[in-house]
Amino acid sequence: MGPDFLKPKAPLGKKIQCLSFTKDYFYKNNISPEKSRILKIFTKLEDIPIQYMNQVHGNRLETIFSHSAFPIDETDSLFSSTSNLALGVLTADCLPIALSKNDGSEFAILHAGWKGLLSGVIESTLTSFTKGCSDVSAWIGPSISLKNYEVGNDLYESFMNKDDGSESNFIWKGHDKWL
């Protein structure tokens, strides 16, 4: 596997697999990035459907009990305890975050951009796990790099107003710009 195909070094949860690949991987290898075939191409899990969502940069969570042929509308987090089901997220600049109980009984996938982070997409998803989140593991997939994501003072101040501990995540660039 090259740098265009990534997975966590350690398992996220029992029987939970995470895969992340870039659009370039498909083009370089002359593979059609058709969503319905992704698991079949890259794993032995050809009969497992992937549930996608139409992401809106918010914090809405949808609990999935069974696969739908259509993406779940207006949501940024999918949660399930259903076996033989994969949850999928499409990202560019935003963070793909996978969560799972260590025993694999509950799992979630999040689309976490700055709007979702400010509105609590991670926190709202963690509340869905039974018996709290002390035995929940996370994997954050690839996203835009710090050096390529300049933001203004307004966004910096929004994060500081939510949590002043956010300051360590920003680098002052000057002229009301932050990385």
Regions found by a protein language model. Name each.
Residues 1-179:
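Active-site microenvironment for binding and transforming phosphate-containing groups
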